[in-house]
UniProtKB/Swiss-Prot annotation:
The lineage of its organism: Eukaryota, Rhodophyta, Bangiophyceae, Cyanidiales, Cyanidiaceae. Residues 61-65 are annotated as: G2. Residues 82-85 are annotated as: G3. Gene3D superfamilies: P-loop containing nucleotide triphosphate hydrolases, Translation factors. The keyword Chloroplast applies. Its main location: plastid. Residues 10-215 form the tr-type G domain. It comes from the Eukaryota. This is Elongation factor Tu, chloroplastic. PROSITE patterns: G_TR_1, G_TR_2. Pfam families: GTP_EFTU (PF00009), GTP_EFTU_D2 (PF03144), GTP_EFTU_D3 (PF03143). InterPro entries: EF-Tu_GTP-bd (IPR041709), EF-Tu_GTPase (IPR050055), EFTu-like_2 (IPR004161), EFTU_2 (IPR033720), G_TR_CS (IPR031157), P-loop_NTPase (IPR027417), Small_GTP-bd (IPR005225), T_Tr_GTP-bd_dom (IPR000795). Belongs to the TRAFAC class translation factor GTPase superfamily. Classic translation factor GTPase family. EF-Tu/EF-1A subfamily. GO terms for cellular component: chloroplast; cytosol.
C-alpha cells in the first residue's frame, strides 16, 4: 500500500489524556476518534481495544507503553497519546517520550478526584504541560446535579493547588462510553443527533480554542548539541550535530556553551550531506564551521547557541523516575550523596544527588527502584541546562533513571 502524504495544512498540536486509573481515559480517546470520524471521513477510527493494547516504545533506555492516535478538527491536526498503565504515564511525562502541548484531564463524576488525579496534575505542572481542560466522565451514572457541581469544585481546587488556573479552566461533562456506543450504532452520526456525542464535539471545540498552538521548533532560539568535532586543514574547526531548535545562517555570531568558559564565534560555513548550506534549521544534521576556534576549545557535550539564550549551570532541581530492577535499573536503594553520571543531550557528567523531596514536601532518606522523586543535583562541571530539559541518570553505562529539570538553582 502506498503511503499517503502528510498534508501540512492545519496547525499541529500534541495532546494527551491524563487522570486516575479506570476513570475513562482510553474510552474518551476512542470516543474522540469515533465522534470526529463520524463527521469527517478523513479521520481514521481507532477502536478501544487498539488503543488499549499499546505497543512498547523505548525512550532514554526505558520501555514505555503508549498509544498514539491521530485525528483532526476543522481547525487543527492532533496527535493524541494515551497510556495504559499509571507507571507508563509517569515514565512518559518525565522522559518526554510523547511531548504534550496540552492535556485532557479525565475525572469520573461518580468517584471524584482520586490519588492519581492529583499525581498527574502535579506531574503536568512539574514537566511543563502548559494547559489542561477537564472532562467529567461517567455523568450518566450521576443523577444529582449538585454532586456534579461538587466534583467540579473539588477538581478546580486541586488544579489551583498546583498553580493551574483552577477558576478559569474549561470543564465539559459527559459520558465517553455512551458517546462511543452511539457512534458504533451509527458511524455517520455527526453533530446534533445524540446529546453524548455532542458533548465530545463540545470538548474538542474547547480544546481547539483553549489549548494554544505551540511555537514551532524552527521559530525558537538556535540550539545545537555538539556530537563530534574535527578540524579541516586550512579551513578551521567543524562541530557536527543535530539542530535541536531554531535556525542558523552563515555569518551569524553564536556562543559555545558548557564545560568551559562560554566563547563567542562566527559561523563561517554550514554543510549537510557533503553539500554546503546557507541556513540550517531545526531537525537538520549539520556540520558547522567555526571561525578562530581550535579543536581543543570545543568538545562533545557543549552546545552551540544563539548568544545569551542559554547559560551553563551546575546545580538544579529535577523530577526523576528511578527504574525498577525488571527495567534494567538498580536492585538496591540509593541515598543522598549518591554520585552517578547525568547524561545531558550528548554527554555524561558526574554529579552528586544532594537530597530527595517527596510529593508532600517532606525529605526522603532513601530512594527505591520504581520510585518517582524530586531531587537536588550538583554537577562537577557546568553544562548548558534549562528548565524542562530531559536527561538520563546512568551508572557504569546503564540507565538507572530518567529526569526532567524543574528548577535551576545555580
Amino acid at each position: 500500500m502506498a503511503r499517503t502524504k502528510f498534508e501540512r495544512t492545519k496547525p499541529h498540536v500534541n495532546i494527551g489524556t491524563i487522570g486516575h486509573v479506570d476513570h475513562g481515559k482510553t474510552t474518551l480517546t476512542a470516543a474522540i476518534s469515533a465522534v470526529l470520524a463520524s463527521k469527517d471521513n478523513t479521520v481514521q477510527l481507532k477502536k478501544f481495544e487498539e488503543i488499549d493494547s499499546a505497543p512498547e516504545e523505548r525512550a532514554r533506555g526505558i520501555t514505555i507503553n503508549t498509544s498514539h492516535v491521530e485525528y483532526q478538527t476543522e481547525k487543527r491536526h492532533y496527535a493524541h497519546v494515551d497510556c495504559p498503565g499509571h507507571a507508563d504515564y509517569v515514565k512518559n511525562m518525565i522522559t518526554g517520550a510523547a511531548q504534550m502541548d496540552g492535556a485532557i484531564l479525565v475525572v469520573s463524576a461518580a468517584d471524584g478526584p482520586m490519588p492519581q488525579t492529583r499525581e498527574h496534575i502535579l506531574l503536568a505542572k512539574q514537566v511543563g504541560v502548559p494547559s489542561i481542560v477537564v472532562f467529567l466522565n461517567k455523568a450518566d451514572m450521576v443523577d444529582d446535579p449538585e454532586l456534579l457541581e461538587l466534583v467540579e469544585l473539588e477538581v478546580r481546587e486541586l488544579l489551583s493547588k498546583y498553580d493551574f488556573p483552577g477558576d478559569t479552566i474549561p470543564f465539559v461533562t459527559g459520558s465517553a462510553l455512551l458517546a462511543l456506543e452511539a457512534c458504533m450504532k451509527n458511524p455517520k452520526i455527526g453533530e446534533g443527533k445524540d446529546k453524548w456525542v455532542d458533548k465530545i464535539f463540545e470538548l474538542m471545540k474547547i480544546v481547539d480554542e483553549y489549548i494554544p498552538t505551540p511555537q514551532r521548533d524552527v521559530d525558537k532560539s538556535f540550539l545545537m548539541a555538539v556530537e563530534d568535532v574535527f578540524s579541516i586543514t586550512g579551513r578551521g574547526t567543524v562541530a557536527t550535530g543535530r539542530i535541536e531548535r531554531g535556525r542558523v545562517k552563515v555569518g551569524e555570531t553564536i556562543e559555545i556553551v558548557g564545560l568551559k568558559n562560554t566563547k563567542t564565534t562566527t559561523v563561517t560555513g554550514l554543510e549537510m550531506f557533503q553539500k554546503t548550506l546557507d541556513e540550517g534549521i531545526a531537525g537538520d544534521n549539520v556540520g558547522v564551521l567555526l571561525r578562530g576556534v581550535q579543536k581543543t576549545d570545543i568538545e562533545r557535550g557543549m552546545v552551540l547557541a544563539k548568544p545569551g539564550s542559554i547559560t551553563p549551570h551546575t546545580k538544579f532541581e529535577a523530577e526523576v523516575y528511578v527504574l525498577t530492577k525488571e527495567e534494567g535499573g538498580r536492585h538496591t536503594p540509593f541515598f543522598p550523596g549518591y554520585r552517578p553520571q547525568f547524561y545531558v543531550r550528548t554527554t555524561d557528567v558526574t554529579g552528586t544527588i544532594e537530597d530527595f523531596t517527596a510529593d508532600d514536601g517532606s525529605k526522603a532518606e532513601m530512594v527505591m527502584p520504581g520510585d518517582r522523586i524530586k531531587m537536588c543535583v550538583n554537577l562537577i562541571y557546568p553544562v548548558a541546562i534549562e528548565q524542562g530539559m530531559r536527561f538520563a541518570i546512568r551508572e557504569g553505562g546503564r540507565t538507572v533513571g530518567a529526569g526532567v529539570v524543574t528548577k535551576i538553582l545555580e
